[in-house]
Amino acid sequence: KYMAPFSPTDVLEEYTRPVRILRSGIMDIVPAISDRHIIEVPGYGEMEGFLTDGLRSLIETLPSSDMYEYTVRWPGHIQRFIDEVEKGTLDHETIIQEWKYDEGTPEFTWLMVEAVSENNDVMAWNVIDEGGKDGHSMARTTGLVTAICTEILIEDENVVPPGVHPPEALPDYAVSRIISEMKSHGVVIEGPEIDL
């Protein structure tokens, strides 16, 4: 059973909004929930990945020839969504109730970032959280970043110039602190260490 850890309306939009990707250095727009495939999630088993439009600012700020974001769900979840859309039986109010978060149900958040160099060297990182007494996993993995960034900005208002900035504009010391503090709160971050 899927539980939306944030607004179900936003999840539904994620499943329908056209997807921006980079392919051979060129931005392309492809249909949402395309390129479906099975992904083995260590410790959790098989899940299904599909393209969604989550690259946001990265597509403009991170030099890359190819860049994609896949959302991962339990097998069968997205097919049920597709079937209901095709039959015309998708009801937003029903979905909001069915996807309501249940604190008694075990859940987890998993993120994998994979970078492939021009020489085909691969580096990969995994972020895993199963929630805890201080909140569910998605709240922890996103909220901790926000809270730590806020602390950094309070301590040093010049960390970035005034204005709106993407997360990747943060200086290296801020990124190192975010990673360190997330780990100290029990969020598992695995992968090669990078000197920042």
How should these model regions be labeled?
Residues 1-196:
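C-terminal catalytic/substrate-binding lobe primarily of soluble NAD(P)-dependent oxidoreductases
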